[in-house]
Amino acid sequence: MNKLLLLILFECIIFLSCSGKGSLESGIPKVSVIVNGTFDDKSFNESALNGIKKVKEEFKIELVLKESSTNSYLSDLEGLKDAGSNLIWLIGYRFSDVAKAVSLQNPEIKYAIIDPVYSEEPIPTNLVGMTFRAQEGAFLTGYIAAKVSKTGKIGFLGGIEGEIVDAFRYGYEAGAKYANKDIKISAHYIGSFNDVEAGRSVATKMYSDGIDIIHHAASLGGIGAIEVAKELGSGHYIIGVDEDQSYLAPNNIITSATKDVGRSLNIFTSNYLKTNTFEGGRLINYGLKEGVVGFVKNPKMIPFELEKEIDNLSSKIINQEIIVPYNKESYEKFLKE
């Protein structure tokens, strides 16, 4: 009898160890998405939300959405783990360190992060990162800005200075200089992605200095800039970011530098659910060639001839005839070539 009980106990232990979180073998898969701040930012986080909603429409999954902040990342991720998540998406570079930490602590769970900032050290095999050549789309919008500016002064409004936002900034500035070497460009950072009022304040000052086009990469701060452009009216323009933001101010938004976070999330998650395979331990990089970054066509503000020029530039970037800079060092090198 004792031997029989031991055998049953042993089989139970084996069963429990094989049916841990992360497996898709039984039950409805649970996919979680955690963001810094709010999903309703009209750009980056919202794009991720739209992407995962499309996955839910196609697959039978349980979806958990979590809005978080720096001080609660670990506890919120612990909660998603305890809830039985198979796959957890972390949206934004601010999760870079914590993504590695939790993936090492929980090898049975799959993790995926958008916009990680990693150097050469190994990535855990249950973690995958999505990175973007955002500078390529921004190069095109910078070219447009320089071509349509009436004052010869354009600007860039960033959230927090760093690798991710710098790609937009220096791509934009390079595209503008490619179009017009004499264009004047002013860049400002508000130190936050969640401060609408700071975006309003800085944008107001930029417009008063004679800048007529502002490219933002500031999330909710950019919403503040859009509000200012809309209030000031004709002659005050914005270039949106991540998604097509023209609906927010149709008469003021010339175009948007798109970075389709939602599409990349959708592609990877759908493949994971279809195949039950997870190829982690790596970074996946998207750009113009993959159709994930680009710009929004707007015949109302972008003349047909200019659009043709942009299409030609896109081909040159895809064919690597133009290598778009992504930081200060590569930008300065670009200007010398």
From Swiss-Prot:
Outcome (variant: residue 257 to S): In strain: PLi
SUPFAM superfamilies according to UniProt: Periplasmic binding protein-like I
Lipid-conjugated positions (S-diacylglycerol cysteine): 18
Residues carrying lipid (N-palmitoyl cysteine): 18
Family membership noted in the UniProt record: Belongs to the BMP lipoprotein family.
The entry's keywords: Cell inner membrane, Cell membrane, Lipoprotein, Membrane, Palmitate, Signal, Transport
Compartments, as annotated in UniProt: Cell inner membrane
Entry function: Immunogenic protein. May be part of an ABC-type nucleoside uptake system involved in the purine salvage pathway.
Species lineage: Bacteria, Pseudomonadati, Spirochaetota, Spirochaetia, Spirochaetales
Outcome following mutation: residue 219 to G: In strain: PLi
Assembly and interaction partners: Monomer.
Outcome when changing residue 125 to A: In strain: PLi
Cited InterPro entries: BMP_lipoprotein (IPR050957), Peripla_BP_I (IPR028082), PnrA-like (IPR003760)
Membrane topology, from the record: Lipid-anchor
GO CC annotation: plasma membrane
Keyword Amino-acid biosynthesis recorded: no
Keyword Secreted on entry: no
Result after altering residue 107 to S: In strain: PLi
Stretch forming the signal peptide: 1-17
Protein name: Basic membrane protein A2
UniProt main location, coarse: membrane
